[in-house]
């Protein structure tokens, strides 16, 4: 026993040895909760003699589950590590054992997004739907919303209805929403497929309808432990209630200050109200932080204290003092990135490995300037959970349009001739390739010379050639940023992204345009198209080594649960972090919790930065409210603070706050929602502009989007 309890602090010791009944652990960031969970599992097995197969330990990611298994195996020496899994993974075990109860085979399919999109493709083709009716992304969201909220009993149709009856229901559907929803249920049943929502719903159905199966699992699971309880949703909570109903041994761990997934249905009230729901709950506060210096924790505590709806608690430092949190105000994104690269180089010169440095950000599009600065300084880096800026599909497509205008080369032609779709598929491209080789011409020239051939009838080949010809004869002397905006509009490329609902890709294109504008400003007369394309090739040749000592770049969401010696949190501006898409006060508190998560990833050094300049919509960019939230004496500023800038930033925050609602209500509409306006007719919501207090709507009968006040009356069409 001694080796399992050795080195544990008082709270950890209490958590490990409190084995019976209902136990809630409020565990702050870096407080050693994973250590407590793994040692508790080992304590149950090694000291109490509980069989591993009678313990359920739930984590929220497969990666966490694998790491937990490894830790427990090292402590117990037993290859049987019980049910250490995600909720969905556990439900797969239930269904594989008792799938006969829902008339499904043991070999059912677990569907991912690509499977769902393939099913949507079949439905759209069968019923003549297009992406104008609903994008795949919007369709997936609609299906999930209907399954969770609007038609939560849907699974009974899947289980009890015959395939023919489901097919008839699908065929009778006459609105896009119903066609897609019932078509999807039919396709699921047809291939015995279950998505993530189905896994829990089907398991709950089995437990509800078959007492013998429910009792079997309840009796088997003598001890249940759940990590990251602040991220649990209603279905997972219901499943947990069922499973612990026999033995009553439930151990939960969570931190209300790290609730960052409410957009996925997480509800922190399950953690906060745990002692009101279950009897004789023992609550353990695990606040000693073993990760960060006192200076980093002081800044994080100061930030999160500004949230009103929380358990008032502070992380307690255990590490010796370090340096103050550094805060840098830059004039431009480029200057911010150059400062970061310089600080990294200074750290590296002091002997800090590059792999100990991590750049965190709220959204991927802010990495462009950072990547350029790192490459310029020859600092190798790698992006986690994302693609390097100049390797992203939409950036490569946009640059290929510019190359087509300037060079009309085959590589660019292959990339964008059918982007957006012009019906120039594999067969016609093969014809072009073969003909080009015979005639000794480029693919583009070959297409120009053969536009009248029957093989190109029914395509938009002529429109494409006309587009390239028009731009190639007129681009010289025009600003490159203007040419790019123009061709992305005239080609229909940006419109196609809007139709798909690809807001992140549109943000990336806006960032590219901004970077070109800044390039033009800095280069003056040298800023020709050819010069720019040669310059940008240096940033997109992928010549950074894949292995070795590299800086890590990742979103804050991707960094959850991780820790890094030195953290650079960039893009700390209103509209970036917090996101411009936040519409409610609870949503703003979640953004602040996300910032808290970012700050508490740092072990030794934390660098916060923002950049002045202009937002995509032309409005001035101000420092984030989260920088203003932190007590100034806790920060080390790199230069004298501009008090006027901070006053203007505070005024900007106050102005934005006027548009934040108390709850989620119906004040704004989701992106992709179809609406009807009394004068303009039907259209699609493209975005919500909180700066203007408006929906951005593309009306069907208009060539360009319109900003419509949030207060204007709009009728929702469909789900």
Residue ranges and their predicted role:
Residues 571-704, 710-719:
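C-terminal accessory regions
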Residues 170, 353, 367-379, 392, ...:
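Conserved helicase C-terminal RecA-like lobe
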Residues 25, 31-37, 279-282, 287-380, ...:
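Helicase P-loop NTPase motor core
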Residues 90-99, 257-262, 291, 384-406:
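Short alpha-helix plus adjacent loop in nuclease-associated cores
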Residues 6-17, 21-26, 36, 56, ...:
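Conserved helicase NTPase motor core
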